Every structure is written in structure tokens, then in C-alpha cells.
A protein has these predicted regions:
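Exposed, interaction-prone assembly regions rather than primary DNA-binding/catalytic cores
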Residues: 131-143
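N-terminal helix-turn-helix DNA-binding core of bacterial DNA-binding proteins
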Residues: 28-74, 101, 132
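Alpha-helical linker/hinge and terminal dimerization helices associated
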Residues: 47, 85, 114-129
């Protein structure tokens, strides 16, 4: 990439690039509210976690069982991000073994119609997969 630069310049270039990316990202949030929402709920696992919490409170192991392909590390990271973003509430009781539950916050529950609209869009715009999605919509929790 920087073939003729001294080694110290690689680090400076990486820092500059990272700060530019962060600045551009923050400008995108200001310019578009949808970008802000997608940053909070986007990605591969967050929508699945939110969907699984729509019916109500779940313990950590219940969540893990309902999303069998997610790793422990990723589930923990995603739960922390959702909690930090105010979309879910983590409650723990100081007992052995640990008793930890997760539930959607008021802000998280407000995403239900958004998630439903996204699921409906997928049914109508995903070709053959739409039939499978349509069957899954029957499991979509009511308000």
C-alpha cells in the first residue's frame, strides 16, 4: 500500500484513515435518520436477538438456545451493544449460578413495527425465500 514510506508513516496513515472514516460516519448519522437506526439494529445478529426478545424476557441460555449458530463471544458482544444503545435491559441477581435476564427496553419495544415492516419487505422481495419468510411471519409476536 505505502511501499516507499517509512514504517512510522504506516501507523500515521492508518490513524488518519480511521479518523476520516469516523468523521464520515458521524456525518452520515446527522444526514440520515435511517442510517442512525441501521447502526443501532443492523448487522447479522442484532435483528435476530431483537426478534427473539419481542415476546418478552429471556434468560441468557434461552437466548443462546434460540440462536444456536451464534457464538458465545458474539452473543455477549451484541447484547452489550444493544444494552449500551438503550434497546435492551439486562437484569442480574447475585446468586449461584448467575441469574441473568434480558428484555427489550421501551425504546427496543418501539422497534417492533419497524422489524415487522422489514420482515414484510423480505417476504415480498426475496424470491423463493419469501415463502419460508411468510411461514415465519406467523411466529412474529403480536404487540
Amino acid at each position: 500500500m505505502y511501499k516507499y514510506l517509512p514504517q512510522s508513516m504506516y501507523t500515521m496513515a492508518a490513524i488518519k484513515e480511521a479518523s476520516t472514516v469516523q468523521e464520515n460516519k458521524s456525518q452520515a448519522f446527522v444526514a440520515c435518520p435511517v442510517t442512525f437506526v441501521m447502526e443501532k439494529v443492523g448487522g447479522y445478529w442484532k435483528p435476530i436477538i431483537l426478534f427473539n426478545l419481542l415476546p418478552g424476557t429471556k434468560r441468557y441460555n434461552e437466548l443462546k438456545r434460540s440462536i444456536p449458530t451464534i457464538t458465545e463471544k458474539v452473543l455477549i458482544q451484541q447484547l452489550k451493544q444493544l444494552e449500551n444503545d438503550g434497546l435492551l435491559i439486562r437484569k442480574s441477581k447475585p446468586v449461584v449460578p448467575p441469574y441473568v435476564t434480558y428484555e427489550l427496553s421501551k425504546s427496543g419495544k418501539a422497534l417492533r413495527p419497524v422489524l415487522y415492516a422489514m420482515a414484510e419487505w423480505a417476504v415480498h422481495n426475496s424470491g423463493r425465500q419469501g415463502k419460508i419468510f411468510s411461514k415465519q411471519m406467523k411466529d412474529f409476536p403480536a404487540e
